[in-house]
């Protein structure tokens, strides 16, 4: 989302939404990008004009120095467009506010995870980590083995079903779709004054987005320019010429 051209993003929305409409009869209104290394401030405008109403991400919590102060907020783009945004806050519960398990060097008290395992500690941790408790009483926890495949396991589903019946000391669990969650979040955002983040969503942890494999990225950009020029001149030729 940092390097991709605006036209490419528009086409991805166009064909992605077309696929869901034709194959599933659904109009997709959520941009779900858990594992992306930062977001251009142009994205809210593109989302809004492509019929996207909500945005979810996770990895932005990996920032090395500056913690983004919101988890549920309006993201404002360079033209003033605002998109309702939610960061997944799932992580294990901590008694001392420090983090916690996994053993990964980037793991801190800020780090969250979209590959949830839906056990009581993670449910408690998701609520503990959430920063807009005074405005919203619901958080989103996605579970299953992602970032390589596998999805939800039978024991994860069984654990989720048991937690839904209630577990002492654990926030109430409800199994539902992301669409249902965001509909409720939109209702809450209309009733409460959600905070606003204006501009780029910058990820500090992976800083080589623009510079690593620079020749590949330069070639990709040349290809994007060439495709746009080809389409433009092809359209003009079809409109005014005998082609």
Indicate where each model-derived feature is located.
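Catalytic-domain carbohydrate-binding cleft regions of carbohydrate-active enzymes
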Residues: 1-243
